[in-house]
């Protein structure tokens, strides 16, 4: 299990805009995002949403499935978990 208790959650402006979109357009997806965030804070690299380490331009980031089409993208460092985006595939 990943040690995340010492890490703070940081939400990017892009992520916040994406979450606002989901709240207005699809509350079920918005709730899924909140569930994924809780799971990531509990264990950054395992759990629901099929965690996947990303490569190339997003090397160092991870993703989890919101829906078949959309992904939650986040980065984990020693002291923080940064939530980067919550719509589309990787931008």
What do these predicted regions represent?
Residues 42-45:
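Generic structural signal for secondary-structure transition and capping sites
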Residues 1-8, 14-31, 35, 48, ...:
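Enriched for short, Lys/Arg-rich terminal
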